[in-house]
Amino acid sequence: MDDRLRSHLRALISERHPVSSPVSLRRAQDYIAEEYRRVGLRVSFHAFRALGGTYKNVIGTLRPARAAFHRAKPPLIIAAHYDTIQDTPGADDNASGLAAMLEAAGRLHEASLSCEIRFIATCLEEQDLLGSVAYAASLREANEEILGAIVLECVGYTSEREGSQTAPPAMPIAIPRVGDFLGIVANTASAPLAKSFEQTAKREVADLKTVLLVVPGQGEQLPDTRRSDHAAFWQFGYPALMLTDTANFRNPHYHRSTDTLETLDLSFICRVAQAVSAMATSL
């Protein structure tokens, strides 16, 4: 698994910005679509207008077997953004999330499923969540229901050093001071989904430490809990959770030129992918 992850990361890590590196952004889009096809997913694109141009969310759809499809629940979304800010290669933010998502897709394509899984690589997350807002809005406009969205946002950096983990002010729960856990962030409406993920992770990936934070409303009282695509789904009334290493509250390379492959914990990314896969098969 480490070899596949490393291959994904090497292909994806580079600045992927809509203005300063559009070719690299398109290359990432093409790579993700090709990886979806390689593991047998049906590929489609959700195009949206933004920043004076057209951008695309890349969707890979995995349906349950024909017999199960007639009894299927609404779809589950597994998402990660593929753009970066300027002047960073974006290893943790967010090639790590993409690699975990692609690894989960590879693990699930022959699994027994009770619902459709949509793997969505979103674009322009770093530009006010434009891609995920456009997609969530399209779901609501079509009156489409989903089981929920699991958003992978910076899942590749760990530290065993005491004091390596910090937290935003006014946190309602105690946060460990060692940055070796996966954060699970949900709002109240998404708490059942988040607790199900937490229980599944503990059962199936025992060496993956997790910390669950549930915030009221849409996280308005703790703005740092709204900093990824899960907030777009909250906005349109859908359950969603963010899985994260907590970004700048742990990773000193966040949004810097030093956010490189060498700083990542591939074993941790593997465990996150295992937990996401286990969640999808347990529904």
Role assignments for model-derived ranges:
Residues 19, 42, 49-51, 64-66, ...:
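Solvent-exposed loop/turn segments at secondary-structure junctions
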Residues 7-65, 211-213:
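A non-catalytic alpha/beta surface segment that caps or lines the substrate-entry region
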Residues 59, 76-79, 118-121, 147-152, ...:
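Structural recognition of the beta-strand scaffold that forms the well-ordered cores
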Residues 163, 167-283:
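Active-site-adjacent substrate-binding region
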Residues 14-24, 44-48, 85-94, 121-122, ...:
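Second-shell loop/turn segments in exported
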Residues 1-26, 83, 249-259:
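N-terminal capping segment at the start of a domain
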